[in-house]
Each structure stands twice: as C-alpha cells, then as structure tokens.
Amino acid sequence: MSEINDTPARLVSAAERLFSEGGEEATSLRAITRAARSNAAAVHYHFGGRDELLRAVLDRQLGPLNGQRVQLIDLARQRHGEPVPVVALLEAVLRPDLELLAKLRRNKVHVARFLGRAHTLPGAAVAEYVRSQNDDLARRLVPLLRQSLPDIDVADLRRRMLLVFATVVMLFATAPDPDQPGLLGTDDVDEQLVRLVAFCAAGMCAPAASDPARVPRKRKKH
C-alpha cells in the first residue's frame, strides 16, 4: 500500500486509539495527526474535518453490522417463513452486536466503550451517521415486525426498536474487562444472545400502551 493511500487508515487508527483511551472531547486534532504521522490538511483532504474523521472511526467498527444483520434476517425468513417470529428477528439483529462486543473486549475494550459513548455525542456528523444506520435497518426490519406484531403501530414499533438499541449501546458503554462477565452475566455469546433477546422480546411483544391523549382525565371534585 502506498504512503498516500495508507494515510486515511493511519488517521482512523490513531483517532480510534486516542478517542477511546483519552476521550473524544479531550483529544485534539493535532494529537491525532501527530500519532498518525500526518497533518491537519490530510484530515480535511481525506475526510473533510474532525467530525467526519470521527464518523469514519465509527464506520470502521459499526459499518459492517447492518450487512450482517440483513444476511441473518434473510436466513430467518428462509427458515421460518413469514411472519418471522419476533425472537428470530431479534436474534438476527442482535447477534452481530454481541459478536463485535466480544471481539473488542478481548483486545480493544476501550474501543467498545467509546462506541457506546459515541451514540450520545453532540455533532451533526455523528447524529447523521447513527440515523442513517438506523434508517437502513428499519427499512428492512419494520415491515417484518408489522407482520409479526400486527396490533402494534409503526411509530410504536420504531420506538421499541430504539429502546432495544439503547440497551445495546449500554452494553458497549459499560463493557467490562475480559475477566469480568458484564451486565449479561456470561462471556458466552450464544448465552448472552438468549438473555438479551428474552429481555428485548418482552418489550417488543408487550401490549400496545394506551394513547395518553385518549385516556379520559378524572374530573376534580369541587
């Protein structure tokens, strides 16, 4: 690989390490370029700026997940037919996250925690990246969930899926060291998936909440 073509990879690697070890707010662009043996002009040339570099760091780890989810969703459709059981859909959606988390915990636990924190960072670039990832998955997943949960409206299904992903974000943000089991109580990915899916399926399949606007208010006694 040429020096020119290697520059973006070195910048992303340096940013990933420094963001995860020292915090994204405390890490200057100058520190990143120094660690990457590069300069600010290269950041602007290859990425457009610091926020876009941060987005590239996220995409290195999170970018492949949706493709993996889609493959697993398609396998679930082939195996079960339609409607696909909610548990099978959740297994397809959540397995890639747990496998990535397990991989990062072995030698990059700080990166796992950073990926969790990053979802709460201000800035248009990160917000747009997270939104685009969620929207891409929702286009494939929501129609299948509608078949499986016909009594839940689309807006509620989307809210419930956001809560599922908020749970995943928490797992990344609180990722324990390799010698500790973490929130799911086990290091075995298959067992983690069983426990996480059981929790999330209960929320996804819960009866639709009453619309507060339609609940009659009690009249005050005078």
Residue ranges and their predicted role:
Residues 8-13, 47-70, 74, 130-131:
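An amphipathic alpha-helix adjacent to DNA-recognition modules
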Residues 93, 97, 112-119, 164-168, ...:
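Short alpha-helical scaffolding segments that buttress acidic/His motifs in well-ordered protein cores
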Residues 70-109, 161:
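Hydrophobic alpha-helical connector segments
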Residues 12, 66, 87-94, 161, ...:
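Short, amphipathic alpha-helical "lid/cap" segments that border enzyme active or binding sites
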